Amino acid sequence: MNIIRKLKPGTISLVLGPMFAGKTTFLIHCIYMLERLEKKVVFIKSTKNTRDKTIKTHSGIQLRPKQCKIIESTQLSDVGSLTDIHAVVVDEAHFFDDLIKCRTWAEEEKIIILAGLNASFEQKMFPPIVRIFPYCSWVKYIGRTCMKCNQHNACFNVRKNADKTLILAGGSELYVTCCNNCLKNTFIKQLQPIKY
């Protein structure tokens, strides 16, 4: 189904998945489609993501927008006025404590597209994602293959080091995504017991 039919003014769309699944690639695709429809788009990136100063995926795909305005911010409430904007695209949405601000933009008839992790390295959902979820009119899950066994769907993000900081930006040097079997059989030793 054509994604553009789902992206309507006044709606919030959410793309979730583990690291390295292609969420940012999906956002870049949406931006290009919106630009072809002559929509003014703003791309919001968290300053907590210190990996790269450009809009670039883990696989090296880089955003080269025609008109898209790129904003780096710690909080969405610091973004300022978006009166002339048709669509707001937020990458790494789990980094924004005030993600619920997107409701205000949706009420202003903006198209909202969010992408974020399905869970932390502790296998817990991020509170900002939990708070915005009920207001999303469309949710897409993007998966990937386990980086350990290459056989099963990976839905878990596992940190390779013992750092317990909740937000620690990084790529494959710090994280691996794995399936349930590999989580239990290989990585569970570095995690505390998972509580549901």
From Swiss-Prot:
Binding residues annotated for ATP, in chain numbering: G17, P18, M19, F20, A21, G22, K23, T24
UniProt cross-references to Pfam families, sorted A to Z: TK (PF00265)
EC number of this enzyme: 2.7.1.21
Catalytic residues as annotated in Swiss-Prot or TrEMBL: E92
Superkingdom in the source lineage: Viruses
Keywords: ATP-binding, DNA synthesis, Kinase, Metal-binding, Nucleotide-binding, Transferase, Virulence, Zinc
GO molecular function: ATP binding; metal ion binding; thymidine kinase activity
Catalytic activities: thymidine + ATP = dTMP + ADP + H(+)
Protein name: Thymidine kinase
